[in-house]
Amino acid sequence: MDVTIQHPWFKRPLGPFYPSRLFDQFFGEGLFEYDLLPFLSSTISPYYRQSLFRTVLDSGVSEVRSDRDKFVIFLDVKHFSPEDLTVKVQEDFVEIHGKHNERQDDHGYISREFHRRYRLPSNVDQSALSCSVSADGMLTFSGPKVQSGLDAGHSERAIPVSREEKPSSAPSS
């Protein structure tokens, strides 16, 4: 008897990227055939399903860069205006919160909310932190690093979010 060996992830129609599209930030923006018939599309072949990986990478993914001179966070917030965003620094953490109230769109009513928390390196100068949102919806949070012998200062404070008119220079994944 021949048995095909498959990784269990490919056998499950409820894998990590499937059908989570029903519950992600694109909820209410239209459905694909495989959203409605997950078991039918997975029984034909798991390899014929359209990949949602690209969609997942393009939606709400953050990138953290920490080099010798600077600490930077890039976060896709294209569904939020700067007024909908709150950025706070508490001790060694930066908290980014976005929420907009329920509003009507082409498919009904929709509301979105997210909360991200990142640990700041101990040598980031917290008095020189900045945050901005580019025209294409990319939030950039950055701060310079200080020499290890200097005190970076730790307290709670809000960071204002400014709007930039040009698109982000962050690399796309």
Swiss-Prot record:
Q: List the protein's name.
A: Alpha-crystallin A chain
Any one Gene Ontology biological process term? negative regulation of apoptotic process
Q: Which residues carry this modification: Deamidated asparagine?
A: 101, 123
The subunit field of the Swiss-Prot or TrEMBL record says: Heteromer composed of three CRYAA and one CRYAB subunits. Inter-subunit bridging via zinc ions enhances stability, which is crucial as there is no protein turn over in the lens. Can also form homodimers and homotetramers (dimers of dimers) which serve as the building blocks of homooligomers. Within homooligomers, the zinc-binding motif is created from residues of 3 different molecules. His-100 and Glu-102 from one molecule are ligands of the zinc ion, and His-107 and His-154 residues from additional molecules complete the site with tetrahedral coordination geometry.
Q: What does this protein do?
A: Contributes to the transparency and refractive index of the lens. Acts as a chaperone, preventing aggregation of various proteins under a wide range of stress conditions. Required for the correct formation of lens intermediate filaments as part of a complex composed of BFSP1, BFSP2 and CRYAA.
Q: Answer whether the UniProt record assigns the keyword Plastid to this protein.
A: no
Occurrences of domain sHSP (ranges): 52-162
Q: Does the keyword NAD apply?
A: no
What GO terms fall under cellular component here? cytoplasm; nucleus
- Region called Disordered, residue ranges: 144-173
Chain intervals with Basic and acidic residues compositional bias: 153-167
PROSITE patterns (alphabetical): SHSP
